[in-house]
A protein has these predicted regions:
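Intrinsic disorder in cytosolic terminal tails and internal cytosolic loops
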Residues: 1-6, 185-192, 376-414
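Helix-loop boundary and gating motifs at the non-cytosolic
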Residues: 4-54, 202-205, 217-230, 237
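Helix-to-loop junctions at the C-terminal end of transmembrane segments
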Residues: 60-72, 153-157, 251-263, 350-351
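Structural signature of the two symmetry-related core transmembrane helices
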Residues: 75-90, 167, 266-281, 363
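Paired small-residue
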Residues: 98-106, 290-298
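Cytoplasmic helix-loop-helix junction between adjacent transmembrane helices
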Residues: 105-140
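Intracellular juxtamembrane helix-capping segments at the cytosolic ends
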Residues: 113-126, 304-319
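C-terminal membrane-cytosol helix-exit motif in multi-pass small-molecule transporters
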Residues: 153-157, 167-187, 369-377
């Protein structure tokens, strides 16, 4: 315990910087759909603009590592945070939808690149024996900070104020990193990913990663629109999203032990059933806001655990450890690729079916995942690795794609 505290203390500036970054990102991401809806933009157009974020993110996973390798982690963080902040501020000068879509792409590119910097630093710095405790602290920082960013929406700010405040947090995030000296890890060249081959090795994990990409990033980008279309304000939307994140965070403290004892497949089924039941109750409940707050807690608990359980399932199924990195990268890529379609899919459903088209998408996703999981076998307990859902289950989980080849073995989860 003392050792993990010393590591966290020594990396205090890094944790402070990432906290400021997550607050700024939470605000700028959650505000997009709300601001566009207030300006009278249609659901499909909102989905297209939000898709820009994930297009930028996918491009970032292909090219950003070159910038980091060339400039070093501290300078790369400064570069990407500056572009991130400027892109956030530029939203305030025009309401042109194409301009906003381009800016969202820049935001996605820079945010994923910044996570790549942060997480490679953590992986290089943290000793194996205390890794889970330090990364648990990192995850706490993420959920708390991102949730605070979303809650800022409840202050009834103007669009100009939202973008200035988010940019201020993002720009401030680079300052603490200039106060530390740390050996900067190397980021190697990318290697090709063979998705069909990976599906043959870890089918349930790959399907779970695809569902998680659609579900998690669809929630972050479109949940506020779901609440607004019911006639509520951005304040209620921010509470709805924050409660769901709290449910996701608390569920992860329980699901690890459950999946270690009973298996990843039963755990995936449990989370899928919880998500599905919550979705059905959303439809039966109608628009009662208090009930939706309660349901969002369980809804978040189900969807936010999907990706971590998929990773754990893959780790259990891999018999050839030389394939662990390739499998991990394939899952992360699948998660990211699915994210591209989540805003568009949900916005189209809401255009056709109204606000609850958002829920219909989750019904289809988790019915499909449940049916597929039922065709798979549970891995015997003696073959399971210790569950550790860290550094992956977040909006930009694919930031770890570019980590060095020892990442999977050090994490003992890929």
């Amino acid at each position: 315990m003392a050792s993990s505290f010393r590591i966290i203390q020594s990396m205090g500036p890094l944790f402070l910087g990432m906290s400021l970054l997550f607050i700024g990102n939470g605000l700028v991401i959650a505000s997009c759909s709300a601001l566009l809806k207030q300006n009278g933009v249609g659901e499909l157009a909102i989905g297209l603009i939000n898709t820009g974020f994930f297009i930028g993110a996918l491009i970032s996973t292909i090219t950003a590592h070159r910038v980091i390798s060339t400039t070093g982690h501290i300078r790369a963080f400064a570069i990407f945070s500056a572009i991130f902040a400027v892109s956030a501020m530029l939203h305030a000068i025009s309401e042109n939808l194409i301009f906003w879509a381009i800016l969202r792409a820049f935001l996605g590119y820079c945010y994923y690149a910044l996570l790549m910097v942060i997480e490679s630093w953590l992986n290089a710095k943290i000793p194996n024996k205390i890794r889970s405790r330090v990364i648990a602290f990192y995850e706490c920082v993420f959920y708390t900070s991102f949730g605070l960013g979303i809650l800022i929406l409840a202050l009834d700010l103007s669009a100009f104020e939202i973008f200035i405040i988010s940019a201020a947090f993002i720009m401030l995030s680079s300052i603490p990193l200039n106060l530390i000296r740390i050996n900067q890890p190397q980021i190697p060249q990318r290697q090709p990913i063979n998705i069909p081959k990976i599906f043959g090795i870890v089918p349930l994990a790959l399907v779970g990663a695809l569902v998680a990409g659609l579900a998690i990033n669809g929630f972050f980008s479109m949940a506020s629109l779901f609440v607004l279309l019911q006639g509520y304000s951005a304040k209620e939307a921010s509470f709805f999203m924050t409660i769901a994140m709290a449910g996701g965070f608390l569920a992860q403290t329980f699901i690890g032990g459950f999946s270690d004892k009973y298996g990843r497949r039963p755990a995936l089924l449990l989370c899928s059933v919880v998500s599905l039941i919550s979705a059905v109750l959303f439809l039966l409940n109608g628009s009662n806001l208090i009930v939706q707050y309660v349901l969002s807690f369980f809804f978040g608990g189900g969807i936010f655990c999907t990706y971590g359980l998929s990773l754990a399932r893959a780790n259990d199924e891999i018999t050839d450890k030389t394939k662990s990195v390739q499998v991990a990268r394939a899952l992360l890529f699948s998660y990211s690729f699915a994210s591209l379609f989540s805003p568009l899919l949900m916005s189209y459903a809401m255009k056709i079916f109204g606000a609850f088209g958002f829920i219909y998408v989750y019904l289809v996703l988790y019915v499909g995942l449940i049916l597929f999981a039922l065709t798979q076998k549970t891995i015997p307990q003696h073959m399971r690795k210790e569950y550790n859902d860290r550094l992956v289950a977040r909006t930009a989980g694919i930031a770890t794609i570019q980590q060095n080849g020892n990442f999977a073995d050090r994490e003992n989860k890929k």
